[in-house]
């Protein structure tokens, strides 16, 4: 069956019902519950990675910011595992959907901004009026700063969506070219297959890095408001 280039990005359905919820919950099965933890190499590696990321992201925060540690660590695990599972053949990657990424970015961004206005009202309002600004430029700067503030969650979501989607499209195109060249030019097909393997390895790195960058930017937004 011939598939469209964007078939893998279509939300899967069963009996007329979307399966996105089940797909989103699936990564949680990869992490053992606390009563079944075994001190093996995999668990030790997960704990080391979580401690390293927590130290890098949360060391800049004060006590109020530290309360977000569990949420941010859960966020990076969820996005990272979802991105990596999406590299499996004939799988669906929820992070290629802008609506889902906006659903993650907007509440986290709004929570950080509301925290800032509650705890540091004057400092938060001061971001709209940089010190030393000439009086005629004040209205324009307030508008620009307001727009830049509301663009932050959109930038978070679009960045994650665009990078993951672009990687999947490249794999799809090169994989299709490899199959087409198999009967025409085996040597060229072998070269494209090697490129496909390298690109897949790069996609594993990209999926992990995008999860880190998304969570890090949320952490920085939180730092600016606590």
Swiss-Prot record:
Major localization class: mitochondrion
Gene Ontology MF terms: proton channel activity; proton-transporting ATP synthase activity, rotational mechanism
Protein's membrane topology: Multi-pass membrane protein
Location in or out of the cell: Mitochondrion inner membrane
UniProt entry keywords in alphabetical sequence: ATP synthesis, CF(0), Hydrogen ion transport, Ion transport, Membrane, Mitochondrion, Mitochondrion inner membrane, Transmembrane, Transmembrane helix, Transport
GO CC list: mitochondrial inner membrane; proton-transporting ATP synthase complex
GO biological process: proton motive force-driven ATP synthesis; proton transmembrane transport
Keyword Zinc: no
InterPro entries, A to Z: ATP_synth_F0_asu (IPR000568), ATP_synth_F0_asu_AS (IPR023011), ATP_synth_F0_asu_bact/mt (IPR045083), F0_ATP_A_sf (IPR035908)
Catalytic activities: H(+)(in) = H(+)(out)
Membrane-spanning segments: 9-29, 68-88, 97-117, 138-158, 184-204
Gene3D superfamilies: ATP synthase, F0 complex, subunit A
Task of the protein: Subunit a, of the mitochondrial membrane ATP synthase complex (F(1)F(0) ATP synthase or Complex V) that produces ATP from ADP in the presence of a proton gradient across the membrane which is generated by electron transport complexes of the respiratory chain. ATP synthase complex consist of a soluble F(1) head domain - the catalytic core - and a membrane F(1) domain - the membrane proton channel. These two domains are linked by a central stalk rotating inside the F(1) region and a stationary peripheral stalk.
Subunit (UniProt): Component of the ATP synthase complex composed at least of ATP5F1A/subunit alpha, ATP5F1B/subunit beta, ATP5MC1/subunit c (homooctomer), MT-ATP6/subunit a, MT-ATP8/subunit 8, ATP5ME/subunit e, ATP5MF/subunit f, ATP5MG/subunit g, ATP5MK/subunit k, ATP5MJ/subunit j, ATP5F1C/subunit gamma, ATP5F1D/subunit delta, ATP5F1E/subunit epsilon, ATP5PF/subunit F6, ATP5PB/subunit b, ATP5PD/subunit d, ATP5PO/subunit OSCP.
Entry's family note: Belongs to the ATPase A chain family.
Listed name of the protein: ATP synthase F(0) complex subunit a
Organism of this sequence: Capra hircus (Goat)
Lineage per the UniProt record: Eukaryota, Metazoa, Chordata, Craniata, Vertebrata
């Amino acid at each position: 069956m011939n598939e469209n280039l964007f078939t893998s990005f279509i939300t899967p359905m069963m009996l007329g019902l979307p399966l996105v919820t089940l797909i989103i919950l699936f990564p949680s099965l990869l992490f053992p519950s606390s009563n079944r933890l075994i001190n093996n190499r995999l668990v030790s590696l997960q704990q080391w990675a979580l401690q390293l990321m927590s130290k890098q992201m949360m060391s800049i925060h004060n006590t109020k910011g530290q309360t977000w540690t569990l949420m941010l660590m859960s966020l990076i695990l969820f996005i990272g595992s979802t991105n990596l599972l999406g590299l499996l053949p004939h799988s669906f990657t929820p992070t290629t959907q802008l609506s889902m990424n906006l659903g993650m970015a907007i509440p986290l961004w709004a929570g950080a901004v509301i925290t800032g206005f509650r705890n540091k009202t004057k400092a938060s309002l001061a971001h709209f009026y940089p010190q030393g600004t000439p009086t005629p430029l004040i209205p324009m700067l307030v508008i620009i700063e307001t727009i830049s503030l509301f663009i932050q969650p959109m930038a978070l979501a679009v960045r994650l969506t665009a990078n993951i989607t672009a990687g999947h499209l490249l794999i799809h195109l090169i994989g299709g070219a490899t199959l087409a060249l198999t009967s025409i030019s085996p040597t060229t097909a072998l070269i494209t297959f090697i490129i496909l393997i390298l690109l897949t390895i790069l996609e594993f790195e990209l999926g992990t890095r995008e999860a880190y960058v998304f969570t890090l930017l949320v952490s920085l937004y939180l730092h600016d408001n606590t």
